[in-house]
Amino acid sequence: MRLVDLLKGVKHEIKGNPNVDISGVCYDSRKAKPKYLFIAIKGFKTDGLLYVEEAIKNGAVAVVTDRDISEYPGVTVVLVEDARAAMAKIASNFYNNPTSKLTLIGITGTNGKTSVTYMLKAILEQQNNKVGLVGTIQNMIGDRVIPTTHTTPESLDLQELFSLMVNEGVKYVVMEVSSHSLALHRVDSCDFDIAVFTNLSQDHLDFHESMEEYAKTKSKLFKMAKKASVINIDDKYSSMMIESSKGKVLTYGIKDFAYVMAKEIKNSLSGVKFKVQIQDKKEEISLKIPGLFSVYNALAAITVADFLGIPLRSVREALSHVTVKGRFEPVETGRDFYVFIDYAHTPDGIRNIMEALKEYEAGRKILVFGAGGDRDKSKRPLMGEVAGKYADFCILTSDNPRSENPKEIIAQIEEGIKKTNCPYVVIEDRREAIRYALSNAQKDDVIILAGKGHETYQIIGDKVIPFDEREIVKEILAESEK
């Protein structure tokens, strides 16, 4: 493919031969090969500009950059306004605009993205469609799993994945869209058909300057979706998403009047039942994941299905089987108490999970949690305060401390929990914290291990240590039987 064809739709200046033949594109100099185009993007930890020479040495014949660089003999230099934005368009051109051949559904919001994608995948597959999934836990084509590194991969990886999906006969793609991916142009040049808004609460304020900025970034998705926007009307940021919408707006909710509504909600530890109403249509829905947040997630999926013309009866059948790894996931203990694993790692996430247990009074609600290092620090005391308000007992521990001191992270959570009357202990080692919870559990207690969810590792310093809470619970219980 000629360089000039790859640059269609990209504002640029060229120094060198615009007709040079390009056989591949990369943003990692180690992946450069003869006849490759290297795109120098600025990352969080390093800068592609530092690796231009290495890319050329490995065979790159052209370089895209948004800053001036030295000229290299025989190498074409393309100067653009924003290398990340340019990469998204170049990637789409290189892979022949794969999203134009797919029905692409993007889901954004602080909480619920993963559950909604899995619910939609189940609904669409029940209609015998081949479905692709792009998400936090994994990427999938049908039942085949493709490992992930970010919630949303870089635009080049994403377009390659979409191209693979097209080649394998995928019709629908359900995709989690993070605020980072919108801000960093990773999903530019994605041809979204439907955008879904779940909710917005405090998270990622280490990256976005304020909640308004965070919301504004999320709203970009609704400008991109050409057919429909599906919006949680009960969320205070819904009006911003509605104003940004280009396609048909469909709302869902529980409190305020909406196109799709849930009534007669009955919650228990084993799931939640409710009646869904879409104008004059009604159906009873049964979910295996309990809680009001679960009802909201299902409503989002139901609204999309309704827009796509899928019968409500089929939707009911598909939703009755859905479970999501690390989302209110029960762990079999063989004891007289309960253990659940959940990804809740924000104040709102913790509130949602504890609200789901609100009516449960048979035993104590014990919460084991920490907060991630090198991430939004302002949410830590809020997490402590919310936990203290809802739990009967808390065990403060480590999550993924990364480069931070775990003791300091825990101290910041403590500031919040001290504002409540909730008794708590601090056990920095997460395995020992889980051991303490299990060994002190009484009949009918519910233990929530919050924060890790689907993750099977812990990041301490720069080391990634295997840490699967399902296995750890089993090991500790087996040890106690000896």
Swiss-Prot record:
The entry's keywords: ATP-binding, Cell cycle, Cell division, Cell shape, Cell wall biogenesis/degradation, Cytoplasm, Ligase, Magnesium, Nucleotide-binding, Peptidoglycan synthesis
List the ranges annotated as motif Meso-diaminopimelate recognition motif.
399-402
One Gene Ontology cellular component annotation held by this UniProt entry: cytoplasm
* Location within or outside the cell: Cytoplasm
Q: In which pathway does it act?
A: Cell wall biogenesis; peptidoglycan biosynthesis
Query: GO terms for molecular function, please?
Result: ATP binding; magnesium ion binding; UDP-N-acetylmuramoylalanyl-D-glutamate-2,6-diaminopimelate ligase activity
The cross-references to SUPFAM superfamilies, in alphabetical order and at most eight, read: MurD-like peptide ligases, catalytic domain, MurD-like peptide ligases, peptide-binding domain, MurE/MurF N-terminal domain
The UniProt entry's sequence similarity note says: Belongs to the MurCDEF family. MurE subfamily.
Instruction: Tell me what this protein is called.
Output: UDP-N-acetylmuramoyl-L-alanyl-D-glutamate--2,6-diaminopimelate ligase
- Which species does the entry assign this protein to? Caldanaerobacter subterraneus subsp. tengcongensis (strain DSM 15242 / JCM 11007 / NBRC 100824 / MB4) (Thermoanaerobacter tengcongensis)
